[in-house]
């Protein structure tokens, strides 16, 4: 089978998130953890992008002029605020329901986002390219991590960045991110994450580096119960984020 004939889409995952699509923008609904997670990942993205492209992170629209892909965008929780920072955003998701919810919310909020019900493979085959690709909380839901990451990396322009965030495959993550979050605290519906599909940092880095990109930064992220918010941490045993850069053209 040729690479172009393969797919990174896990239809059972698409169906699971499509069934919850109406709750994307409810801060107390099934996507509450992502609403809580948004501030720390947005700050991380903004600061790192601005550092790379020589922008002022405190500017009103610091990402003005940059083309950004939010792959696996869901209902648009990340796409919208990134667009508000001035970026030209393409939000892609294989779920028609997710894209419908995202498009409606953006229109009602007066935010311009180019939402498309497409896969990473379809975008790459169409010759799309981006200054920044956001691959956030997605790899643990795809059918082929290496192919997915490689496909995304091919669309990063010279000098551009790719961000990734996911959950580590450790016993600590199994206890906290799956058992506690889904069965005890009920923050997420049961079955949202499967332990065997979680991705270790080195497993995520391998296809990124093989695609000609350099890992520039890694960080753990932890939830502070007392503060009721997520913070960056050196501990990558559960949640973590990383940023990679494609070398600038000679």
Swiss-Prot record:
Please tell me the species this chain comes from: Agrobacterium fabrum (strain C58 / ATCC 33970) (Agrobacterium tumefaciens (strain C58))
Which positions does UniProt annotate for S-adenosyl-L-methionine binding? 41, 72, 93, 136
Catalytic activity line of the entry: a 3-demethylubiquinol + S-adenosyl-L-methionine = a ubiquinol + S-adenosyl-L-homocysteine + H(+); a 3-(all-trans-polyprenyl)benzene-1,2-diol + S-adenosyl-L-methionine = a 2-methoxy-6-(all-trans-polyprenyl)phenol + S-adenosyl-L-homocysteine + H(+)
Q: Which SUPFAM superfamilies match?
A: S-adenosyl-L-methionine-dependent methyltransferases
Give the metabolic or biological pathway: Cofactor biosynthesis; ubiquinone biosynthesis
Tell me which InterPro entries the record gives: Methyltransf_11 (IPR013216), SAM-dependent_MTases_sf (IPR029063), UbiG_MeTrfase (IPR010233)
- Enumerate the Pfam families for this protein: Methyltransf_11 (PF08241)
Key word Hydrolase present = no
Keyword field contains Aminoacyl-tRNA synthetase = no
GO biological processes: methylation
What gene codes for this chain? Answer: ubiG
CDD domains linked to this entry = AdoMet_MTases
In its UniProt entry, what is this protein called?
Answer: Ubiquinone biosynthesis O-methyltransferase
EC number in record: 2.1.1.222, 2.1.1.64
Report the sequence similarity comment from the record.
Belongs to the methyltransferase superfamily. UbiG/COQ3 family.
Membrane-crossing segments per the record: none
Question: Which residues lie in coiled coils?
Answer: none
- What is the role of this chain? O-methyltransferase that catalyzes the 2 O-methylation steps in the ubiquinone biosynthetic pathway.
UniProt keywords (A-Z) are: Methyltransferase, S-adenosyl-L-methionine, Transferase, Ubiquinone biosynthesis
Q: What class of enzyme is it?
A: transferase
Single GO term (MF)? 2-polyprenyl-6-hydroxyphenol methylase activity
């Amino acid at each position: 089978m040729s690479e172009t004939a393969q797919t990174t889409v896990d239809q059972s995952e698409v169906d699971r998130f499509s069934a919850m699509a109406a709750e994307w923008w409810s801060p107390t609904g099934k996507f509450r953890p992502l609403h809580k997670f948004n501030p720390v990942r947005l700050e991380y993205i903004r600061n790192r992008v601005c550092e790379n492209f020589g922008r002022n992170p405190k500017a009103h629209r610091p990402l003005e002029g940059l083309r950004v892909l939010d792959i696996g965008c869901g209902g648009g929780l990340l796409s919208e605020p990134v667009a508000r920072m001035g970026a030209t955003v393409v939000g892609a998701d294989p779920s028609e329901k997710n894209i419908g919810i995202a498009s409606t919310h953006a229109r009602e909020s007066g935010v311009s986002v180019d939402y498309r019900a497409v896969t990473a493979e379809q975008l790459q085959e169409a010759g799309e390219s981006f200054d920044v690709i956001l691959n956030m909380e997605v790899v643990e839901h795809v059918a082929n991590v290496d192919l997915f990451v490689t496909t995304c990396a091919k669309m990063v322009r010279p000098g551009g960045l790719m961000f990734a965030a996911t959950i580590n495959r450790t016993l600590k993550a199994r206890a906290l991110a799956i058992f506690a979050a889904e069965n005890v605290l009920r923050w997420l519906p049961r079955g949202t994450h499967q332990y065997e599909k979680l991705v270790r940092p080195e497993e995520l880095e391998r296809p990124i580096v093989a695609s000609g990109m350099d890992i520039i930064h890694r960080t753990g992220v932890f939830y502070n119960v007392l503060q009721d918010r997520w913070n960056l941490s050196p501990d990558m045993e559960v949640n973590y984020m990383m940023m990679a850069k494609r070398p600038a053209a000679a």
